Amino acid sequence: MLPIDIVYFSNYSGNTKRFVEKIDYGNISINIPIDRGSGSSLTVNSPYVLFVPTYGGGEGRAAIPRQVRSFLNVKENRALLRGVVGFGNTNFGEHFCKAADLISAKTGVPVIAKVEIFGTQQDVDKVKERLTLLYGQEL
């Protein structure tokens, strides 16, 4: 188990949630609720990595789901963010995983990985490896 939690946002498709479950992480995994505005009522109290999909084809600020923006607007949540894993569709070209890029640029944390839609086993292994390199022990 690593000294870092996972916070994720997964819409109705459930792609991000399924990916987080495949990691079989052992730490706390917190889901930002889909209900609009509910992200601002959720606070974390330990360091975490954010797993986030890209919305709207990656165009501008709308690339970051509203619930995730609300969550990150809470100062304490932003302070504990240590990295971001992005999910997207390569059909959107330069906007692939744009939400992760925008969050990284705004907060100064690294983009740990970019995952196509719901990811492959290779993506799961890559994310596990990178989390281990960044935060310690084997997953």
PLM region descriptions:
Residues 44-139:
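FMN-binding flavodoxin-like domain, especially the glycine-rich phosphate-binding loop
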Residues 1-65:
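N-terminal beta1-alpha1-beta2 submodule of the flavodoxin-like/Rossmannoid cofactor-binding fold
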